[in-house]
From Swiss-Prot:
Residues 5-103 form the BMC circularly permuted domain. Transmembrane segments: none annotated. Gene3D superfamilies: 3.30.70.1710. InterPro entries: BMC_CP, BMC_dom, CcmK-like_sf, EutS/PduU/CutR. This is Bacterial microcompartment shell protein EutS. One of its GO terms (biological process) is protein hexamerization. Keywords: Bacterial microcompartment. Homohexamer with a central pore; the hexamer is not symmetric, it is bent by about 40 degrees; bending depends on Gly-39. Interacts with the N-terminus of EutC and of EutE, targeting them to the interior of the BMC.
Length: 111
């Protein structure tokens, strides 16, 4: 009986895969995410994961936002602040990664 083998590989590209703004999140959602009293939450996923550190730096320099979560292994970044600040930070971070590092970009989405 032959065994079937599956090999999974992580092949990092240079990509912003998600840039989403949650305006006026409900209290329960904000609490579960760990950013109570946030006017808005920005969520990004990036490849390679280490890009989250660069994205966090760009976001903090772009607007008056705070980092709620950053994981350099999974490439996740959560920022929070006012709606205008989070929107500006996400926009500047996405465009900065494209301009400075030639990343493949996604459209910023909102809810």
């Amino acid at each position: 009986m032959d065994k079937e083998r599956i090999i999974q590989e992580f092949v990092p590209g240079k990509q912003v895969t998600l840039a989403h703004l949650i305006a006026h999140p409900g209290e329960e959602l904000a609490k579960k995410i760990g950013v109570p009293d946030a006017g808005a939450i920005g969520i990004m996923t990036l490849t390679p994961g280490e890009t989250a550190m660069i994205a966090g730096d760009l976001a903090l320099k772009a607007a008056d936002v705070h980092i709620g979560f950053l994981d350099r292994f999974s490439g996740a970044l959560v920022i929070y602040g006012s709606v205008g600040a989070v929107e500006e930070a996400l926009s500047q971070t996405v465009s900065g990664l494209g301009r400075l590092l030639n990343y493949t970009l996604c459209e910023m989405t909102k809810s």
